[in-house]
A protein has these predicted regions:
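Membrane-embedded helix-loop-helix hairpins and adjacent transmembrane boundary segments
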Residues: 1-695
Length: 695
């Protein structure tokens, strides 16, 4: 494209997306007017879902293509700012949109590891990888590994790692799609998954990277508006200020004060004591599960007969009968139930129900900071998590592929800057939102009588007891903080209702979360399908396949992968961020050493890269798997999990990356130097002219 053509293309994009933004604002205002006129909530939620998905589908349909360059890299003509916006949407997954504020609510200072790690990772992308990958100028990350190191093995390992990492991550996005769609429409979680899945497929299936790019720009506009509006509005209602980032210190001071009051509250301590007794009871049941099953059945039967004898209300009798029907029928089911009861009771018996104090650094949930060893362990895990997220961000295939789409190397570097700016805009708001939600819970919810609990809490409890849950543990009829459990995944979606904001804002947030999940799912599905169609099918299985045939095969892989991810997500994974962290650890261990060495170390060779990737993956995945109690039980090992330096399994990349680096360096030095064509490629990567694949 000539300079004049590029300028006109960019101006046309400015006009179109400015009009689109005005249209989004007008649509929200129209639905706000409809709410005031009496529209039912499911009409408003359905309108948000239908309108946004139709817009994304329209962009995908308009951008459909079978051209190879357009399908894989959007024709390499995406302006830096718009690629930055698309990258931010690709990045702002369900985990970022839904989980970041939630984890800051639950973990306080410890949750900042996610923000530091993710934003720091983009600095590594800008300095170490993005410009050089754009200069390389092919389609995928396995493409780079195959061209730089030669042979089949580096490319094949790259394909396997890209598919594994991206599939773990896309399952989380589909889970988020199901959660948000069910919130918008009232559908069940499983139906919500497959309804939302249509919005994912229509973009990535029809137009590949071209459709995904322009859809992601539109999705970023929706998600950033959806995140910032409730933050500003809640702060206005709580402090009277329009500038939340400058004034939410007021709410933070109140939160810190209330935490101290709750820790000293006799009613809270009574609730903790009752939970501790329940934990001991669950432990006793686990000692002899069959006997515990008999005892539970007899106890419930006695309670039912006593209620009937006392002519108790029918609702109370029916409640006991439902409890009898829900009793586990097998020993395995009973053991799983007692283990869940034990985990819940142990967490709720901790101070503040296991929620960390908001401003206290390096303290595990429930700990008051008096144990030096606990603080040391928390500090190690904080730094390990930051390390894994930074390295994983710099090695995530669906992120790096975006920098193939710019018009030049300079645009690729500028694009990283734009990406970081658009991402930071949301990440600056997340800590403020977490504090505002906790302020609302402490000042408006805790201390409320159970008969006056807000409708939003009842509705979320009905949707999924794992997301929101209350129980009058001490029987005083007043909600204590230890009798409340809110999952991190639902806090952002429920925040507008907590703050008493209009219903249209609640559904705007849900639409933003849907945009975040759809945008990342699109990018991940495309990464998986391209790895399978381009790197496996074309480069290894059938090198004579035509471009049209490869594109069609990629579309088929999009469909198959989406259905598989939907099935796994329908199993209702618990918590978003642990799965995301695991994906980043795997990406860091698999790709980061080989990619950076491929650019900056001429002596790195095929054998070194192959062994380095395999060793890094093996150490990382092995540490994760062996840390799982179920795996240890299956292997007949002691139930106590393995913890090197007390590092959590999800941060296994802190061991996998160094292991991969050591293996890559040693094997490269002990085996013959790379072939001249691969050395020449390294030299060309460091010079301005474009690079062509050499294998």
């Amino acid at each position: 494209m000539t300079l004049e053509t590029t300028r006109r293309f960019t101006q046309r994009l400015h006009r179109r997306y400015a009009g689109y933004t005005l249209g989004v604002v007008a649509f929200v205002i129209a639905l706000a007017a409809a709410e005031r006129s009496g529209w039912p909530r499911h009409w408003i939620g359905g309108s948000f879902l239908i309108a946004t998905v139709l817009v994304y589908a329209g962009i995908g349909l308009f951008s459909r293509t079978t051209d190879e360059a357009e399908y894989y890299v959007a024709g390499r003509r995406v302006p830096a700012m718009y690629n930055g916006m698309a990258t931010a949407a690709d990045w702002m997954s369900a985990a970022s949109f839904l989980g970041t504020a939630g984890v800051l609510y639950l973990q306080g200072f410890g949750g900042l590891a996610y923000i530091i790690g993710w934003t720091g990772g983009y600095c590594l992308v800008a300095m170490l990888l993005a410009p050089y990958l754009r200069r390389f100028g092919q389609f995928t990350i396995p493409d780079f590994l195959g061209a730089r190191y030669g042979g089949v093995l580096p490319r094949l390992i790259g394909v396997a790692a890209a598919v594994t990492v991206s599939f773990v991550y896309v399952v989380v996005q589909v889970y988020g799609v199901g959660l948000i769609t069910s919130h918008l429409t009232g559908f069940s979680f499983e139906i919500g998954i497959f309804v939302g899945l249509g919005g994912v497929l229509v973009c990535s299936f029809l137009g590949g990277m071209r459709a995904v790019t322009w859809t992601q720009v539109a999705q970023y506009i929706v998600l950033i508006l959806a995140y910032m509006v409730p933050v500003v509005w809640m702060n206005l209602s709580q402090t009277g200020s329009w500038t939340p980032l400058l004034t939410y210190g007021h709410q933070l001071r109140v939160v810190v004060q209330r935490e101290g009051e709750l820790l000293a509250d006799p009613a809270e301590r009574q609730v903790q004591s009752i939970w501790a007794q329940r934990a001991e009871e669950a432990q006793r049941k686990l000692v002899d599960v069959p006997a515990a099953m008999v005892d539970d059945a007899q106890r419930l039967a006695r309670e039912r007969e006593a209620l009937r004898a006392d002519d108790a209300p029918l609702a109370r009798i029916q409640q006991i009968e439902r409890a009898i029907r829900r009793q586990p029928r097998t020993e395995a089911d009973a053991r799983a139930l007692y283990e869940r009861d034990l985990a819940l009771a142990q967490q709720q018996s901790q101070p503040l129900a296991g929620v960390s104090r908001q401003t206290e650094p390096f303290v595990r949930p429930g700990d008051r900071g008096s144990d030096d060893s606990a603080q040391t362990s928390a500090r190690r895990n904080f730094l390990a998590l930051v390390f894994c997220l930074m390295m994983g961000t710099a090695a995530m295939p669906h992120v790096l592929t975006r920098y193939y789409t710019t018009a030049s190397v300079a645009d690729a570097r500028r694009s990283v800057g734009w990406s970081l700016a658009f991402i930071v805009l949301l990440y600056l708001c997340a800590p403020a939102l977490a504090v505002m939600v906790k302020y609302q819970v402490f000042t408006e919810l805790v201390g409320t009588s159970f008969g006056s609990l807000p409708e939003w809490l009842r509705r979320w409890s009905r949707l999924d007891a794992g997301l929101a849950w209350v129980q009058d543990v001490n029987g005083d009829g007043v909600l204590q903080f230890g009798e409340l459990r809110l999952a991190s995944d639902m806090l952002v979606l429920a925040a507008p209702e907590m703050g008493g904001l209009p219903l249209v804002v609640t559904y705007l947030v849900a639409a933003g979360g849907l945009a975040a999940a759809l945008s990342t799912a699109d990018g991940l599905l495309l990464t998986i399908s391209n790895a399978l169609s381009h790197d496996l099918y074309y480069r290894i299985v059938n090198p004579r396949a035509s471009a049209v045939r490869r594109v069609m095969f990629s579309k088929l892989m999009v469909l198959v992968t989406a259905v598989g991810a939907a099935w796994v997500a329908s199993l209702r994974i618990a918590g978003i961020l642990p799965f995301v962290t695991a994906a980043f650890s795997l990406a860091a261990a698999a790709f980061f050493p080989a990619l950076v060495a491929g650019v900056f170390w001429r002596r790195a060779n095929r054998a070194g890269a192959t062994v380095g990737m395999l060793v890094g993956l093996a150490v990382c995945a092995g540490y994760m798997v062996v840390g799982l109690p179920a795996v240890r039980l299956w292997l007949g090992w002691a139930p106590d999990p393995v913890r090197w330096f007390d590092i959590e399994p999800v941060s296994a990349g802190v061991f996998g990356v160094p292991a991969g680096v050591v293996a890559l360096v040693l094997v490269s030095l002990l085996t013959p130097a790379p072939e001249p064509k691969h050395l020449e490629m390294v030299d060309r990567l460091r010079r301005p002219e474009p690079v062509r694949a050499t294998d």
